Amino acid sequence: MLVKMEIDLAKGFAPWKEMFIQNEHRLNAHGGKLVFAGTPSDNENKLTVIMYFESMESLKNFGSDEELTKTRVEAGAMVETGVMTIMNEASFICTKS
């Protein structure tokens, strides 16, 4: 399942990106994978992330990981501003390699 997350960043994109690179294995351990992460060219404090999760249980496990949430907050993620959208089952990533 694909999930879009939008969240404000207090410290800009660079600290969040570094945090993600160092902790990607934790997302993967929850059955998640990053598809896309980025900010608009005119505002590096508005993050959009697209992730793939194996199941709803995987997504719930990711969301309830308090240690990872603390790490994200330390990198500037303002988790209270987060908006999560579960994408339609017909959504897709790529049709050709």
Where are these regions (language model features)?
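Residue-level detector of flexible, active-site-proximal loop/helix-junction positions
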Residues: S41, A75, S91
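An amphipathic, aromatic/His-enriched active-site/gating alpha helix that lines ligand/cofactor pockets
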Residues: I21-L34, E54-I86
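Short, low-order "capping/linker" segments at domain edges
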Residues: M87-S97
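Short, well-ordered beta-strand segments in beta-rich or mixed alpha/beta enzyme
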Residues: L2-D8, F36-D65
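Short alpha-helical linear motifs
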Residues: D42-E44, T85-N88
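Short, surface-exposed ligand-recognition loops at beta-strand->loop->(often short) alpha-helix junctions
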Residues: D8-E18
